[in-house]
């Protein structure tokens, strides 16, 4: 019986081989097998059929705590306000109050706001490393911040230039935790204004430019963003310098821009927030990281709902739609708006209303002074 079964199996095998001869490829198929396509070009539309709920207006009025309006001193704010109204943006925080460092720029920006839309804008000030080697630099820094706040500034924005590009008179890199800058952080704590600080860039900018780099396309498109251990310093070192000032100045409130480049490791970010109760984070330019891990991100927002602010960074009204869709809907598998930032698809977090309210405006009202609360529901 065993031999009979083996004979039948062998006969079936040979019959199947004869019945299914090797098919020759057609010329068209042969050509297809030799085709190549670069990564930038390959971008097929999804064939997945699922509910789509694009959102062009936030569910609740929101405060964008990370925005740059370099033309604020002379611009017609009515055009900007009309765009804000379409998005349901109640307040825009212009982090570039001094523009490229000019006190007159800050004064005229505040004058334009106060004379036209005093309840729709908040302006932050900025500092410079000019004269950092000269006696009295720290005192002058503190005096400038105090004067700017009296003028109408409600926070201090630190660009990534500190840690990446600022140098002293000898050409040495100025570290974020340089003691000569301590007066600035201390003065902000004394005045009750937050410091929104951007340190470094995504860690992938320091990694080899090869097939294993998730930011390969961005670096190819923007090669000037490539960094190294000596250009200007290791990523981890720069980030640690930032964390050092958080710990050194517990009476100062800091907003760690772009989630401190830890949105791709929310367990690490959670530990960071646990260790630094004076630190908040904002979601500018990292929504794609949250959108590809909806369950993990949902748990994070549940646990740290009082520590996260809404921020966008680059101002383009249509790009806000993606933020709203990630935060408010349960949509599946939809694209980010810049492939070179994120080539993957995202999923909606479908955050509950109470968390959305905290993210959109309640936390910012708590952290940033002098925002008019009357434009928000509760």
Regions found by a protein language model. Give the residues of each.
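Active-site gating/metal-coordination segments in enzymes
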Residues: 29-31, 50, 105-225
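Hydrophobic faces of well-ordered beta-strands that scaffold small-molecule active sites
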Residues: 63-67, 91-95, 121-126, 156-158, ...
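An N-terminally biased module of ancient metal coordination in phosphate/nucleic-acid-related enzymes
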Residues: 20-116
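Acidic-and-aromatic substrate-binding clefts and catalytic sites of carbohydrate-active enzymes
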Residues: 69-77, 96-106, 130-139, 166, ...
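Acidic (Asp/Glu)-rich catalytic clusters
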Residues: 52-57, 80-88, 107-121, 143-153, ...
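Active-site gating loops and adjacent loop-to-helix segments of metal-dependent hydrolytic enzymes
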Residues: 26-41, 59, 203-229, 280, ...
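Bacterial N-terminal signal peptides
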Residues: 5-13
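H/E-rich (His + Asp/Glu) clusters that bind or coordinate divalent metals
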Residues: 73-74, 81, 230, 235-244, ...
């Amino acid at each position: 019986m065993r031999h009979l079964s083996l004979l039948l199996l062998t006969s079936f095998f040979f019959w199947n081989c004869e019945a299914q001869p090797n098919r020759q490829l057609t010329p068209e198929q042969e050509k297809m097998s030799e085709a190549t396509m670069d990564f930038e070009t390959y971008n097929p539309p999804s064939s997945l059929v699922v509910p789509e709920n694009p959102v062009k207006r936030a569910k609740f009025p929101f405060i964008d705590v990370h925005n740059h309006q370099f033309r604020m001193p002379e611009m017609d704010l009515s055009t900007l306000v009309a765009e804000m109204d379409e998005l349901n943006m109640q307040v825009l925080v212009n982090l570039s109050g001094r523009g490229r460092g000019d006190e007159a720029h800050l004064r005229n920006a505040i004058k334009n706001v106060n004379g036209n839309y005093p309840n729709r804008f908040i302006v932050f000030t900025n500092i410079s490393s000019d004269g950092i080697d000269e006696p009295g630099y720290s005192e002058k820094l503190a005096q400038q911040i105090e004067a700017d706040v009296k003028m109408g500034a409600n926070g201090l924005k630190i660009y990534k230039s500190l840690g990446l590009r600022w140098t002293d008179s000898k050409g040495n890199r100025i570290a974020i935790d340089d003691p000569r800058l301590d007066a600035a952080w201390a003065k902000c704590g004394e005045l009750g204004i937050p410091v929104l600080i951007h340190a470094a860039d995504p860690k992938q900018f320091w990694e080899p430019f090869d097939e294993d780099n998730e930011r390969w396309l961005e670096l190819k498109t923007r090669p000037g963003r490539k960094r190294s251990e000596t250009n200007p310093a290791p990523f981890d070192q720069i980030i640690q310098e930032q964390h050092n000032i958080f710990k050194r100045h517990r009476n100062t409130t800091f907003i760690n821009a772009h989630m401190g480049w830890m949105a791709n490791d929310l367990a690490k970010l959670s530990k960071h927030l646990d260790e630094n109760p004076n630190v908040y984070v904002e979601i500018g330019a990292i929504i794609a990281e949250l959108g590809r891990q909806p369950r993990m991100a949902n748990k994070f927002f549940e646990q740290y709902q009082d520590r996260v602010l809404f921020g966008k960074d680059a101002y383009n009204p249509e790009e806000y739609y993606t933020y709203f869709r990630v935060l408010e809907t349960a949509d599946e598998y939809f694209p980010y708006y810049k492939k070179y930032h994120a080539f993957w698809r995202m999923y909606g977090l479908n955050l509950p209303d109470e968390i959305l309210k905290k993210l959109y405006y309640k936390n910012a009202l708590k952290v940033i002074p002098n925002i008019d609360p009357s434009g928000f529901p509760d």
